[in-house]
């Protein structure tokens, strides 16, 4: 849910002053660059009020997962940032709630 899958952009942000990642560390920490071989169901969800870079990372990571798994669900949450996207998982009327329940075999 609204994850950071590519740490390389952090190298060029003020946040990296505290984190102090170098290019190799950023790539090693980035899930998007790992070779994924498990064919398991995945849900990638993000809010449409997220910054464009966060949206791009979610879409790109979902595409990477699609190459490793035929069962990847990309869910875009209207009028939500990452906090509100997390709240959506408990909304029984939301697609995220329904897909999460399905993932865990709850219905």
Model-assigned labels for residue ranges:
Residues 43-45, 55-62, 66-107:
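C-terminal catalytic histidine-bearing segment of alpha/beta-hydrolase fold enzymes
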Residues 2-64:
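The feature captures the conserved acid-bearing segment of alpha/beta-hydrolase catalytic domains
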């Amino acid at each position: 849910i609204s994850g950071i899958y590519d740490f390389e952009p952090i190298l060029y942000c003020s946040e990296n002053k505290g984190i102090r990642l170098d290019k190799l560390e950023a790539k090693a920490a980035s899930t998007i660059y790992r070779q994924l071989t498990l064919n398991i169901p995945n849900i990638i969800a993000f809010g449409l009020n997220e910054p464009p870079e966060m949206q791009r990372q979610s879409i790109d990571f979902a595409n990477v997962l699609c190459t490793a798994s035929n069962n990847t669900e990309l869910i875009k949450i209207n009028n939500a940032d990452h906090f509100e996207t997390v709240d959506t998982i408990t909304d029984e009327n939301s697609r995220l709630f329904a897909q999460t329940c399905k993932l865990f075999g709850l219905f």
